[in-house]
A protein has these predicted regions:
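Glycine-rich portal/gate segments that line the openings of hydrophobic small-molecule binding cavities
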Residues: 44-95, 162
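Short, surface-exposed charged micro-motifs
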Residues: 40, 68-70, 108-112
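A conserved amphipathic terminal alpha-helix motif
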Residues: 137-184
Length: 184
């Protein structure tokens, strides 16, 4: 088995006031689309989702990690995405150049007013136990684990940094959409 664990945290200032930023990030179903390498597979309910982390590593190995999550809007301007219990897990599978398993995805966004802007403290974690692809079984386990750890940390940084950029870039379009709905 390959142990996949990665986490990252970032703090950034969003160019809008706190209630507006909280409403924007509270639309989690939309925001999930801004996560690089992660796609929305299914919305069970407006606050419950199945996600898929999918990458091709070392130019050959297709890695797929499914995670069932729910969102919670907490007191104090906090949004949490955390594991959804009770869903049937995806069956772990492996091939010569592929591995699929159920994993866990969590994130936390805390919002704080900074003048006319909002500071966002964002953290994310992904973890899973992947069956070792057949093409990697001849390599020593410690070597595979080190490679997996290095790749996972790189991918998690890409996800967090990409999410921040994509969400900030998408905000004006969301704002225009909200204003159009108000005019009707």
């Amino acid at each position: 088995m390959i142990n996949v664990v990665g986490s990252a945290s970032r703090s950034f200032v969003f160019p809008a006031d706190l209630p507006m930023v909280y409403a924007f990030y509270g639309d989690v179903g939309r925001l999930l689309n801004y996560l690089p390498h992660i796609s929305l597979v299914r919305a069970y309910e407006p606050d419950r989702f199945r996600l898929l982390y999918s990458t091709t590593e070392l130019g050959t190995y297709q890695i797929r990690i499914f995670a069932d999550v729910q969102t919670t809007l907490d007191k104090g301007w906090v949004i949490r995405v955390h594991p959804l219990e009770g869903m049937p897990p995806v069956k772990a599978e492996t091939g010569v150049n592929s591995s699929t398993a159920q994993g866990y995805f969590t994130s936390r966004s805390a919002f704080k007013e900074v003048g006319d802007h909002t500071r966002v403290e964002y953290s994310l974690q992904l973890r899973a136990q992947l069956p070792t692809p057949l093409g990697l079984r001849l390599m020593p386990g410690m070597v595979v684990d080190r490679i997996a750890a290095s790749i996972t940390h790189m991918r998690i940084r890409e996800i967090v940094d990409g999410f921040i950029k994509r969400s900030v870039d998408a905000f004006p379009y969301w704002l225009a959409e909200m204003e159009n709905h108000r005019s009707f």
